[in-house]
C-alpha cells in the first residue's frame, strides 16, 4: 500500500473519530456537572472509549449484512436515551434527597455509553460497506472518544464548581437538547 494513501486514510478516519468524539465531549460536558470524582471521570472515559470500539466494529460486521435503514434507527435510539438521561438529571437536580434515578456508574453508565456511541454504530455500518481497515478505525474511534469524553467531563466538573446547585440542571438541559437534536431534523 502506498504511504500517501495510508496517511490519507488515517487523516480521514481521524476526522470521523473526532466528529464522533465531539458527541461524547458534548454529553460528557453535561454529565461532568453531576459532581463526579476523578476515578469516575477516568472510568467513564474508558467505558465510552470501549463502546466507541465495540459499536463501530459491530456496525462494520452488520454493514455487510444489513441495509442502511438501521443507521437512522440507531440515531433515534441514541437520541431517546440522551433525552431520558437529560430529564433524569433535571429532575434529580430538584430532588432534595440527592438520589439519582440513572447515575454515571453501573447500569446508568452502560445506558450513557450506549446512548453516546450509537452513532458510531451507524458510521461503522457505512464503513463496513466500504471495506475500511477495522483495526485502525476502531482504534481511532475509541481513542478520540475516550480523550474527548475526559475533556468534556473535566470541563463540566469545572463549570459545576462555578454554578453550584444549578449545574446538574444545566447538565441535564445539555443532554436533553443533544437528545432532541438527534431526534429532530434541526
UniProtKB/Swiss-Prot annotation:
Q: Which InterPro entries match?
A: Mntp/YtaF, Put_MntP
Q: Where in the cell is it found?
A: Cell membrane
Is the keyword Endoplasmic reticulum assigned to this protein? no
GO MF annotation terms: manganese ion transmembrane transporter activity
In Pfam terms, one family for this protein is Mntp
Q: Name one GO cellular component term.
A: plasma membrane
Chief place where the protein resides: membrane
Cystine pairs annotated here are none
Q: Which UniProt keywords apply?
A: Cell membrane, Ion transport, Manganese, Membrane, Transmembrane, Transmembrane helix, Transport
Annotated membrane-spanning segments are 5-25, 41-61, 72-92, 107-127, 135-155, 166-186
What membrane topology is annotated for this entry?
A: Multi-pass membrane protein
Q: Which family does it belong to?
A: Belongs to the MntP (TC 9.B.29) family.
Q: What does this protein do?
A: Probably functions as a manganese efflux pump.
**Name the UniProt record assigns to this protein:** Putative manganese efflux pump MntP
Instruction: Tell me the classification of the organism that encodes this protein.
Output: Bacteria, Bacillati, Bacillota, Bacilli, Bacillales
Amino acid at each position: 500500500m502506498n504511504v500517501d494513501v495510508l496517511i490519507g486514510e488515517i487523516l480521514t478516519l481521524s476526522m470521523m473519530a473526532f466528529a464522533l468524539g465531539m458527541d461524547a465531549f458534548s454529553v460528557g460536558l453535561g454529565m461532568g456537572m453531576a459532581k463526579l470524582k476523578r476515578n469516575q471521570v477516568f472510568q467513564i472515559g474508558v467505558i465510552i472509549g470501549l463502546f466507541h470500539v465495540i459499536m463501530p466494529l459491530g456496525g462494520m460486521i452488520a454493514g455487510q449484512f444489513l441495509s442502511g435503514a438501521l443507521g437512522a434507527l440507531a440515531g433515534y435510539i441514541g437520541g431517546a436515551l440522551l433525552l431520558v438521561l437529560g430529564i433524569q438529571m433535571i429532575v434529580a437536580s430538584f430532588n432534595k434527597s440527592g438520589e439519582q434515578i440513572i447515575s454515571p456508574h453501573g447500569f446508568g453508565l452502560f445506558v450513557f455509553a450506549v446512548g453516546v456511541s450509537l452513532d458510531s454504530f451507524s458510521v461503522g455500518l457505512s464503513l463496513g460497506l466500504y471495506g475500511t481497515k477495522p483495526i485502525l478505525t476502531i482504534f481511532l474511534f475509541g481513542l478520540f472518544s475516550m480523550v474527548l469524553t475526559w475533556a468534556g467531563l473535566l470541563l463540566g466538573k469545572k463549570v459545576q464548581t462555578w454554578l453550584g446547585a444549578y449545574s446538574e440542571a444545566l447538565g441535564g438541559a445539555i443532554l436533553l437538547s443533544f437528545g432532541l437534536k438527534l431526534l429532530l431534523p434541526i
